[in-house]
């Protein structure tokens, strides 16, 4: 599948086999729904503990794979990220398949909300009725029209 093909770049640091050894990065078998620093025998940086949500939910994997160092400042993962949503979705789907009991898939609404959150900010005005000029910093992450 596409996700498995894309994940070959990850194999330099991660293993994907059930019971597989950790490498430079932790083994990723069963990662979806697992505690963020839950791979025994791997020395994590601590950046993921500081992030909040204790488990690797779909939304967290999507954000982390988009920009790992933005999601978890101080992470040891030296990967710039995957810009294309379809690449992230393929990897996450592949990771989901690496389980004896895969986590249920997200709903279409959850997917749409996450894509809107990660979309680049709009650079032009939103056509607000406010007569005063507002700066781009006044817009929220959810204001997109792409």
What are these regions (language model features)?
Residues 42-59, 63-66, 70-146:
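Flexible coil segments in periplasmic/lumen-exposed cytochrome c-class electron-transfer proteins
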Residues 22-27:
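Short cysteine/histidine-rich zinc-coordinating motifs and their immediately flanking basic loops
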Residues 1-7:
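Electrostatic cytochrome c docking/interface patches
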Residues 9-12:
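Short, cysteine/histidine-rich loop/knuckle motifs that typically chelate Zn2+
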Residues 31, 35-38, 68-72:
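A short secondary-structure junction motif
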Residues 14-20, 33-34:
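Detector for the c-type heme attachment site
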């Amino acid at each position: 599948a596409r996700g498995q093909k894309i994940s070959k770049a990850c194999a330099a640091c991660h293993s994907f086999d059930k019971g597989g050894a950790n490498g430079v990065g932790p083994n990723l078998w069963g990662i979806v729904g697992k505690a963020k620093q839950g791979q025994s025998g791997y020395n994590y940086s601590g950046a993921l503990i500081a992030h909040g949500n204790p488990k690797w939910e779909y939304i967290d994997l999507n954000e982390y794979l988009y920009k790992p160092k933005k999601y978890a400042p101080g992470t040891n993962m030296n990967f710039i990220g995957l810009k294309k949503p379809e690449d992230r979705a393929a990897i996450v789907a592949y990771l989901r398949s690496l389980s004896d009991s895969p986590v249920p898939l997200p709903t279409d609404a959850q997917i749409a909300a996450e894509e809107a959150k990660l979309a680049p900010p709009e650079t032009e005005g939103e056509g607000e009725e406010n007569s005063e000029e507002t700066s781009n910093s006044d817009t929220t992450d959810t204001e997109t029209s792409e």
